[in-house]
Amino acid sequence: VPMLGACITEMVGMGIGEVSPALSFGVDVNDEGLIEGFEIVPSLVRVKRLTYSQAEQLMASEPLNSLRMITDRSRLRRASAGAAFIEMPETKLTVRESDSTPVIEFESLPPLPARELVAEAMILAGEAAALYASRELLPFPFSVQPPPTEGGDDDPEGLAGMFALRRRQPRSRIATSM
């Protein structure tokens, strides 16, 4: 079920046309990873689709290298504040038929810094949006999650440790205030 109707999706969908409408986030992050200021502006962007492997080749170039340093500081701040990082392997699932029998293949994809950069940039933009909504007293949906339940390793390793940490995470809930 589409989130928006076909007419709206054609107007505002990312990468559907040559130029797409967007909200662009400019975020000033200090050395401790805290947001010191931000700007949210309507913009027009040209979307270029890349695989994570293609993006990986661009990670050392600007502006991605500078963006990576900013998102690294933000991630370190979140870690020091107690954020849980559940690092599950990304997998590609393929189903094919062999002699009229379905064959399911799993391929474990390597962890890539480009994938982490995208995730951390989205978290940072979400934090700026939340700060804006709070400052302007706008009703805004927040995902709220209490700390994990006690009784587990605070620094799990390996796949089994990550599954155990995920099981200790209480369900998140949606709220309109932080």
Please provide the spans of the model-predicted regions.
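Electropositive polyanion-binding surfaces
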Residues: 1-178
